[in-house]
Design a protein with these regions (language model features):
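Cys-dependent protein tyrosine phosphatase-like superfamily
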Residues: 1-193
Length: 193
């Protein structure tokens, strides 16, 4: 079994992938698979042909297309697996764009990769960033900045972006009740696209 808290995917200076992991039984062979489809490893029981099989706890995988997001499946020789992706995405205009996938809830379920992201403001994305974010398939952007911040630096994801935008300003000191109020309907969420 993989220790998900010790499984990581990062890009190096050449934008190739450095993957590291820890298993509860070290020394076993691990096969690594790659896809550009975030749902591929969730849908298919057969991940295909491995890029690499190793007894090590790290691997360097060539990034064959730097404009596309890649997802990885690590499979132990016992058949146990872990789906991984980069936590911090390489965007020029916002250095803190992160995928929240891979985190485990108290109930034991794991959030899928490529479904929920968090970031700072999206108003300073480069054209290259716009193309990269478009391929992520975002459907909803929730802006938690204060209204003045949203007005001064509006979120823009490109002319042909296909997402809904929701303004959900969080005032300083109001974080404690924000989610509770959202669930109770005190804070309204409207489609403003």
């Amino acid at each position: 079994m993989f220790d998900l808290s010790a499984c990581h995917v990062n890009r190096n200076a050449d934008e190739d992938y450095e993957i590291s992991w820890r298993t509860l039984e070290p020394g076993h062979r691990v096969s690594i698979y790659m896809s550009d489809d975030p749902e591929f490893f969730y849908r298919h029981q057969n991940p295909g042909i491995p890029l690499l099989t190793t007894c090590d706890t790290k691997a360097l995988i060539a990034n064959t297309d730097k404009s596309v997001r890649h997802y990885f499946y690590l499979q132990s020789e016992q058949g146990e697996g872990a789906i991984l992706a980069e936590r911090k995405l390489s965007l020029e205009g916002t250095p803190n764009f992160r995928d929240l996938g891979g985190y485990q809830a108290q109930c034991g379920r794991t959030l899928k990769w490529g479904k929920l992201y968090r970031s700072r403001k999206l108003s300073s994305l480069s054209e290259k960033d716009h193309q990269y974010v478009k391929r992520l398939g975002l459907t909803l952007v929730c802006d938690l900045r204060q209204v003045l911040e949203q007005e001064l630096e509006p979120t823009f994801l490109g002319e042909d972006s296909n997402h809904n935008y929701v303004s959900l300003p969080v005032s300083p000191g109001s974080r404690g009740n924000f989610m509770e109020n959202l669930h109770r309907g005190i804070i309204a969420v409207e489609d403003s696209s």
